[in-house]
Amino acid sequence: MEKISLDTNPDSNLYFELHKSKVEIILGLVQISHGMAEHKGRYSEFISFLNENGFHVAIYDHRGHGDRILESKIGYFGDEDGWDLVVGDLLAVHKETNRLFPNVSKILLGHSMGSWIALSALQQETLFDGVLLSGSTYPNSLDIMLQKILLKIEILRLSNKGYSTILHKIIFGGFNGKFKNTRT
C-alpha cells in the first residue's frame, strides 16, 4: 500500500491509499467512497478481496472521518460549501488515479453517504467506466424538509461544528435494532 498526498486546498490534508493488486492481469481500479460515520480502515478485508481478484483500490477518508477528523470535529466538512469540498476530494482522487493508470477501467463504489457523494460527482463529470451504489436512499420531500429543520435547530444549539447525539440517535439508532449482538 502506498499513500499519495493531494494538494486540493491548504486545509484539506487529503491523501489516499493505493492498494495495488499483484495479479498478472489487472481488471480495473475501484475507488471507494465510504459511508457516514465510517472510515477507510473498515474496508481492509474488502480491499484484500478486490486485490486478490485483479483490482487496484484507491480509498481515502472523507473530511471529518477517520484520519481527517480535525480537532475532534467528527463529520465536519467545512465552514462553507462543505459538500462541494467533499465531492471535489472524490474527483481529485479520481483525477490522480486516472493519471497513474490511464488505460485501466475505473469503477466508483459509493456506500451510503458515499453513494450520495458519488452521485454528486457524477453530475459534474462522468469519468468512471462503472459505478456501484450500495446502501443508498432516496428520502421523500417531507423527510428532507424535517431533516433540514432539525439540522438548523442543532446548529443553533451546538454550532455548525458541534456533534449532535440527538441526530446520531435518529440517523443510526435503529440500524442494529433487530440484532442481539451489535458489535461492529
Locate the predicted segments by residue:
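N-terminal cap/lid segment of alpha/beta-hydrolase-fold proteins
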Residues: 1-23
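Active-site glycine-rich loops that stabilize anionic/oxyanionic intermediates
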Residues: 27-38, 112
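Conserved alpha/beta-hydrolase
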Residues: 42, 47-73
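Alpha/beta-hydrolase active-site loop
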Residues: 78-98
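Short beta-strand immediately N-terminal to the catalytic nucleophile in serine-hydrolase-like folds
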Residues: 108-110, 134
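Gly/Ala-rich beta-loop-alpha elbow adjacent to hydrolase catalytic centers
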Residues: 110-114, 118
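Alpha/beta-hydrolase-fold enzymes
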Residues: 118-184
